[in-house]
Amino acid sequence: MESTPKKAPRSKFPALLVVALALVALVFVIWRVDSAPSTNDAYASADTIDVVPEVSGRIVELAVTDNQAVKQGDLLFRIDPRPYEANLAKAEASLAALDKQIMLTQRSVDAQQFGADSVNATVEKARAAAKQATDTLRRTEPLLKEGFVSAEDVDRARTAQRAAEADLNAVLLQAQSAASAVSGVDALVAQRAAVEADIALTKLHLEMTTVRAPFDGRIISLKTSVGQFASAMRPIFTLIDTRHWYVIANFRETDLKNIRSGTPATIRLMSDSGKTFEGKVDSIGYGVLPDDGGLVLGGLPKVSRSINWVRVAQRFPVKIMVDKPDPEMFRIGASAVANLEPQ
C-alpha cells in the first residue's frame, strides 16, 4: 500500500510580516495623532460690531439689505438731517448776532476806556488831596490845645478833610463803572467761544446722520426699514468683519504641549470638505467653564466633554487665523475640521 506523502509545513514568515506591518502602522498612527493633533470640534468665526447711530432721528435712507456684502466707506443708512441742519443754522445766526454785539460794545468800550484812563488820573489826584487834608487835620488838632490855632481853623481843616474823602469816593465809583464797562467785552468774547463750540458740536451731529461701513464686511440681523425712528446708541444691525476669519478649534489638553503660537494648520469646512485652507495658530485659551460642578467664572467659554461617565481630557479653545479665507464659504458658526502640524 502506497504511503501518502506528508505536506510540507507552511512558513510562518508571511503571517509574522503582516503582524509586524500592522504594529508598525499602529505605532505610526499613534505617533501621528500625538504629533499632529486634529479635531472636528471646531467652528468658523469672525469679529463683529453692532452698527448704531450716534444721533437719534428717523431713517430716511437705507442703502443695504440683510446678508449683503459691503466695502469700507459704503453708505449704510442716513438719519433725517433736517433737525440738525436747523440747529446749525440757529447756532450760526447766534454767532453772527453776537459778533455784531461785540463790535458795537467794543466801540463803546474804546470810548469808555479813554474816560477810564482820565478817571484813573482823577482818582490819583483825589487820593493825594485826601491824604493831604488828613495830614493837615492831624497836625492842626494838637495845636488847638497850645493856642497856636483857633477852633475855626480846626473846623476848616476837618471840613476840607471830609470834602477830600467825599471827592475820592466819588471818583472811585466812576473808576469802577468804567472798569465794568470794559469787562463787558470779555464776557461777550467768552460767550462767543461757547457758541463756536456749539457750532462745532452741531456740525459733528450733522455728519453723524450719515453712517458708513468702517471696514469690509457683511450685514446680518437687519430688521428695520426706512421710516423707522432710530435712537442714538441703539443697534440697527450687526456687521461681520470679513477681512479676518479664524477658527476656534477645541483640542484636548493632552494635545496642547506641542501647540504654539504660529503653529501651521489646515482647515476644512463641512460645507465643502474637499477644499482646504491654510492658517496659523494665533493663541491658546487659558480658561474654560468646567462642566462637572467646579468653580464657575463669568466670561469663560464652556466646552463640553464628549464622555461624562469617564474622566476624559478637558478641551481648550485654540484660535487659528485663516490666511486666505473664501468670503463666500466662511460663515460664523460653520462647522470645521482643524489639523495642526507642529514643527
Swiss-Prot record:
Residues 34-343 are periplasmic. The keyword GTP-binding does not apply. Residues 1-12 are cytoplasmic. Pfam families: CusB_dom_1, HlyD_D23. The chain crosses the membrane at residues 13-33. One of its GO terms (cellular component) is plasma membrane. It comes from the Bacteria. Its main location: membrane. Keywords: Antibiotic resistance, Cell inner membrane, Cell membrane, Membrane, Signal-anchor, Transmembrane, Transmembrane helix, Transport. SUPFAM superfamilies: HlyD-like secretion proteins. Belongs to the membrane fusion protein (MFP) (TC 8.A.1) family. NCBIfam families: 8a0101 (TIGR00998), PRK10476.1 (NF007785). Could be involved in resistance to puromycin, acriflavine and tetraphenylarsonium chloride. Could be part of a tripartite efflux system composed of MdtN, MdtO and MdtP. This is Multidrug resistance protein MdtN.
